[in-house]
């Protein structure tokens, strides 16, 4: 009798069941989602929250760095105390000289008196004289400057170095925490977030956070200390003037606040747009073969560019705000100059409260402080960008997982038998809450039995397995193991009891031994060998160059589908799990391998609970219990005989399969009656007997008649990845030479109008500083004039000039900010687009290189384009600004004292040496840092792209450990970089004070001995030293410049590479009457990444137009490789592939592929709507909806699509994750049908379908083949026997060919494969 579904009592464990309601439903997931939504709406990152990952050591480093930054900041207003005193000395000295020049005055007894005048004979003037030795005074002041310079060198080094080290440590911890949280968030959450979106922070956002919490912050603290100290000094001694000067500070603060808020908001929007673009890039590069096959390169570039446009808009808006308010603040500062000198001169000249030196000291203390506030705006931009970037990262880190795979909570049973029950389970995928997948599913899976779940695609079979594995939690109801709700279990313990093999196996980038050892880390070599033998993988592994130590590429991409599946099965078997889940586990195998693996699985059944999802009745018959599923519910249960009597879901499945195979069996019996093949029945015992008999027979005759299965085309495994890298033709990343500045500049050529305007603004802004020095020295000179009215007149005129400079600065600063933001964003967008386009234009062999994994390429794409701006865009504005500054300063300086100017210029080489050293060392750091982060990016991409496999085998911690180990390299480099940058920064700051020291000493000599006016000394020194300061400020961008040269070099390397197969080329032959005649002529081929392994060895086969050719052979014999040659993913090393008599190498690549449609065994769908996925079949035109529907109907997917709430607008999720495999395959078939190709390639196109769908789709494919040339790769006889030509392959060559009847008459390899009962391989 068939068993009815029995509901057992459930043992609930205390606090672990807090989510159960009175009705038994479990609503914790829903509540969590609501909490997450509320949280995400209110997340705002405060500035100090950026340092939440700091340790006590980091805090100490930041405190010491801040203390040194404060001391450094005090140095500037502190030196003004010396400067003010020195000014009074200069003015007193010049005043004395001016008075002594008056006829009738002389210095008598250190007092100026009138002489030789009858009226004023010997009348004293009261002015002291003869007491000042100006040269000695300047020696004293020079000593003060030198002492402060040495202090600045020390504090400058410490502030940059300590903050850099602390930031590096915190960023490292932040990266680790973010990756840990992603890995423990659960499958449901990852479904709702694309892999590209989750990966983007690793390459972009963390860099922005680092910029906001490392050297920029130290410089900001230094800059903020100057105004604070200056204001304190001013208020303590000269409050009147200080109060007037500081009155404009609130307006400056308002501008700074607006900049901070606006930039933060715009940066957040910009980052989100880039994250979407990164998601597109990751998806496309991960699916490169599908994109190439359907000619989607241009379409994908356009899709990528659309997201870049949004980012560009926000970036330009950010530049407008920055330019406007930077100009606004400079305008206020110059207005403040005018006000301060006008009012200050009144206090000096009319009221006599202050000396000129005091006026200068107050003024410069406050104004330099205000200037530092203005210069802090780039830091504010970095802080705002860092906060915006941290917002989404911290939101993820703080999010509470619905299913925490690393939680230590939950029960662990000492013994487990494997009893599983579903209690009224209803389930919706988190990303598609409106679609009910399971609908009150109730079923019991008894321990030690093999239970098969059968039913049409989309019935919820695979979903049920995912609930057992606790990838998701049920929306309602519960799943129990040993009568315990699995939501109360320890997740890792539960998953360790489960082994899983899926239809589309995922193998990570390791040796085969390590791939299998992922199942159990403590497995010995003997365990690995035993598991490989049980999975029928041992023989092909031993044929590999390095056997179990062979490296087979990312995802196992260098193995055939069947070989990958067998390794995945070995990985599951080595766990020796109590519960084994088989989700279409053998669908990718040829019949030969499937039979052997099925027997191996049947041997492991003892003591294990096996739950199998399969479509083939031959696979299902070995089950003890069969459960029929339909519409998300279990509708029948029983043994095979019972379900056949019931005539329900299973009966319909078997009937369809039987009808399909009946013709096959009759044909075989007719052709081979002498072999007396017993007719197969539905009896489980008979099936197993015949299976074992066929296996025994195969051991005698199998493909030993054929040549021995060739070694699988894989590359030799090297002891390390570095050794493997040496074997590549491309240079290692560390060998890339920095790009030339000239070529980098050419990148911005299309934006020359913007850059011209911006450069004009920058030139004016650069001239402002030396003009300020000129006006400032002019004002000082007026205080030594004897005529008070003349003093007042000149000061008023100079104040008006300051107002004029303010107005000009407002306009030019805005012009510079806007135009360079515009040109920079256009450059970034174009570079990203060109880089992405160049990547998609590479040949498929290029993507086989381990350095060009999807993770590495998306990381490179995201960072390189933005970092190139470090040598172009706004950096050009900085260079023009600095160049103009120096040029105008030199002109002024040489006009007034060429000797003093030359003395100061002697210090310029020291500044240049500092910048050159910094550039050279940081360039090396940038290259190595990029390489190390790309390796980490490969790990994150591999883990997140295959999160189901990672979770299924419980290796989250292993990936986390590997990722964290890779982070050690960039961390150590960041420590070295902090020391180098700190030393260079301290030196560049110190040299200004040393230059001042020497200049004033020499200036005193020139005043004393050559009569140089003191105002000229001020004018020359101020102009030259301020211009040198501008150069020093420009050198602070050296790290960005160093990174830019490396990033640009990498871009040029990509853009300059000429792929052997250029998809964008318009060259090549085209013809109107494309027939579809195909000839493989003595084709020999080795994959570019493994040239030592021969995959095709003289493949020769021809087919006429509208014929069907079927390739038959063992896994790894080159069947799929031949299809890739036809698609021109690769070209043969020897021989030709002829299309209508044209050598494929000479045919236009776009024209060729536009006439070919392909349906692969593992369908790749994109994260867009079903409609867009089907439209992807023909990217040359806009496909009307009628054609899409017609193609869907032919592929038997239309009814399913119409049952969805959003119908054809339904998003299929990342890689089609929201659909069953059968649904994905049918959409892929519809995509091929809508292409209407002349040549149709079917690579196991129906292997993933249930019998009912397979029959209908096979009919559709048969119709689609009419009038077309078709190449079929299949393992099932029914799929290939009606082919016009059947080619049996082995060792990369065709060993026999003909029709089914001809090959049966020949009684060769094909005949024996059919007649012995041994499946076709």
Swiss-Prot record:
Residue ranges of every copy of the ABC transmembrane type-1 domain listed in the record? 62-385, 755-1043
Question: According to the UniProt entry, how is activity regulated?
Answer: The uptake of taurocholate is inhibited by taurolithocholate sulfate with an IC(50) of 9 uM. Pravastatin competitively inhibits the transport of taurocholic acid. Cyclosporin A, glibenclamide, rifampicin and troglitazonestrongly competitively inhibit the transport activity of taurocholate. The canalicular transport activity of taurocholate is strongly dependent on canalicular membrane cholesterol content. The uptake of taurocholate is increased by short- and medium-chain fatty acids. Cholesterol increases transport capacity of taurocholate without affecting the affinity for the substrate.
Query: What reaction does this enzyme carry out catalytically?
Result: cholate(in) + ATP + H2O = cholate(out) + ADP + phosphate + H(+); taurocholate(in) + ATP + H2O = taurocholate(out) + ADP + phosphate + H(+); glycocholate(in) + ATP + H2O = glycocholate(out) + ADP + phosphate + H(+); glycochenodeoxycholate(in) + ATP + H2O = glycochenodeoxycholate(out) + ADP + phosphate + H(+)
**In what way is this protein post-translationally modified?**
N-glycosylated.
Cytoplasmic side, ranges:
1-62, 169-215, 262-319, 375-755, 816-869, 912-979, 1033-1321
Has the keyword Repeat been applied to this entry?
yes
Main localisation: membrane
Q: What is this protein called?
A: Bile salt export pump
Q: Which organism is it from?
A: Oryctolagus cuniculus (Rabbit)
Taxonomic classification, please? Eukaryota, Metazoa, Chordata, Craniata, Vertebrata
